[in-house]
């Protein structure tokens, strides 16, 4: 699996994730504004954090 792993508005970067079957994109708001985090897997999140998990290479853009 190949997933994007940059945060918020940083330039796109990718990571190869051996053994993973998902990529994720998490989004939440704090005093800095909207924060976006991308990576491998499909983590559980706290209330108030949006999560999108997908199963194809680079699908978490």
Swiss-Prot record:
User: Does DNA-binding appear among the keywords?
Assistant: no
Which cysteines in this chain are paired by disulphide bridges?
3-23, 17-40, 42-53, 54-59
PROSITE patterns xref list: SNAKE_TOXIN
Which InterPro entries does the UniProt record give? Answer: Snake_3FTx, Snake_toxin-like_sf, Snake_toxin_con_site, Toxin_cobra-type
What tissue specificity is annotated for this entry?
A: Expressed by the venom gland.
Could you give a GO molecular-function term held by this entry?
A: toxin activity
SUPFAM superfamilies named among the record's database cross-references: Snake toxin-like
Keyword line: Acetylcholine receptor inhibiting toxin, Disulfide bond, Ion channel impairing toxin, Neurotoxin, Postsynaptic neurotoxin, Secreted, Toxin
Query: Where would you say this protein principally sits, based on its record?
Result: secreted
Q: Which family does it belong to?
A: Belongs to the three-finger toxin family. Short-chain subfamily. Type I alpha-neurotoxin sub-subfamily.
Q: According to its UniProt entry, what is the function of this protein? A: Binds to muscle nicotinic acetylcholine receptor (nAChR) and inhibit acetylcholine from binding to the receptor, thereby impairing neuromuscular transmission.
Q: What is the name listed in the Swiss-Prot or TrEMBL entry for this protein?
A: Short neurotoxin 2
């Amino acid at each position: 699996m190949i997933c994007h792993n940059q945060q918020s508005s940083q330039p796109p970067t990718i990571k190869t994730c051996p053994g993973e079957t998902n990529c994720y994109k998490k989004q939440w708001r704090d005093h800095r504004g909207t924060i976006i985090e991308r990576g491998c897997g499909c983590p559980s999140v706290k209330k108030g954090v949006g999560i999108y998990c997908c199963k194809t290479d680079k699908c978490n853009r």
